[in-house]
């Protein structure tokens, strides 16, 4: 919708999307599991095979939903050199320290840390949990480059000035966006769950490297949620996600007789900053409404054609 709107309004846009095929953890902080490595080990496949499978599945769904593909699709594993060069700039500006074999970003060196989430560093320190990584000076410091992996048999590693290892997952977004969009660009999108950690860290490292503003506008979308299970002890609806077990695939909807565009129409019924509650009743309503809209448009086009002939 954003892509089509900007194009309709006459803006010269360039849409860049990254594919995280290295170092993606199950959470935004450094203490999560490595999703790619875990899945590869479970399926007895390589990390790149797992990444390729899900990338193809993702774009297959994108096409079925009639979503315009990005102008640039870039893989993290193909931009390691750019990440290393960006980390060098951050290091040259005295924002880093080595500890336990890993290179960390020191958030105390960036005064505006937490501004996206309207949090200051002192408030963050006061509410911090027990630090899992004892090498960190501050619980909110984050890894720019790992040489001492906590994961056994880390599949992909590269040479770097800090030793053989791999990048933290925040740095890829900054490095690739700067390569294709420059040191400052207009719009960065993402889920609201990325505000307090991932996007906050992106800003710190990007502006720590360049010394100026990185992104002009942030657009954060809310979650698609599902009604709680009858056996749940929570009164709240849950985010639809694979990790929680309460998720549906686009193919599931198609198998139940819905068109992929019925699902797209369902999502368009809510503001992007509002949670969307999924239900089969809502899907039926979206299916019927889209059918009625298509019929009305067809009648208008037929009427216009007849008028032109007359």
Spans of features found by a protein language model:
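Alpha-helical recognition segments enriched in aromatics with Gly/Pro capping
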Residues: 1-6, 59-60, 81-303
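N-terminal, positively charged nucleic-acid-binding surface of large information/translation enzymes
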Residues: 1-66
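Residue-level recognition of the N-termini of beta-strands and the immediately preceding loop/turn
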Residues: 13, 70-72, 185, 215-216
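Short, glycine/charge-rich beta-strand/loop segments that flank catalytic centers
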Residues: 16-23, 51-58, 68-83, 101-109
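The substrate-binding groove and active-site-proximal loops of carbohydrate-active enzymes
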Residues: 38-47, 72-77, 163, 191-192
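Short, intrinsically disordered, charge-balanced linker/junction segments flanking boundaries
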Residues: 305-310
């Amino acid at each position: 919708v954003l892509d089509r709107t900007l194009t309709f309004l006459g803006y010269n846009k360039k849409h860049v999307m990254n594919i995280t095929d290295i170092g993606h953890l199950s959470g935004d902080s450094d203490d999560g599991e490595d999703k790619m490595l875990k899945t590869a080990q479970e399926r007895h496949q390589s990390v790149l095979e797992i990444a390729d499978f899900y990338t193809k599945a993702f774009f297959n769904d994108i096409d079925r939903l009639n979503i315009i593909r990005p102008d640039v699709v870039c893989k993290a594993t193909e931009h390691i050199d750019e990440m290393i060069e960006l980390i060098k700039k951050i290091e040259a500006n005295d924002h880093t320290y080595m500890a336990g074999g890993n290179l960390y970003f020191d958030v105390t060196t960036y005064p505006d840390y937490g501004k996206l989430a309207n949090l200051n560093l002192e408030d963050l320190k006061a509410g911090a949990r027990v630090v899992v990584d004892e090498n960190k000076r501050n619980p909110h410091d984050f890894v720019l480059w790992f040489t001492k992996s906590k994961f056994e048999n880390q599949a992909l590693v590269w040479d770097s000035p800090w030793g053989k290892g791999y990048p933290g997952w925040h740095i890829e977004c900054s490095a690739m966006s700067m390569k294709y969009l420059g040191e400052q660009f207009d719009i960065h999108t993402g889920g609201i769950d990325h505000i307090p950690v991932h996007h906050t860290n992106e800003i710190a490292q990007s502006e720590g490297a360049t010394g100026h503003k990185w992104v002009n506008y942030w657009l954060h979308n809310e979650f698609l949620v599902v009604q709680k299970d009858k056996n749940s002890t929570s009164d709240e609806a849950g985010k639809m996600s694979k990790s929680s077990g309460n998720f549906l695939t686009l193919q599931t909807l198609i198998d139940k007789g819905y068109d992929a565009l019925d699902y797209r129409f369902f999502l368009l019924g809510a503001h992007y900053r509002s949670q969307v509650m999924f239900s089969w009743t809502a899907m039926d309503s979206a299916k019927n409404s889209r059918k009625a809209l298509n019929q009305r448009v067809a009648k208008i086009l037929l009427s216009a054609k007849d008028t032109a002939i007359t």
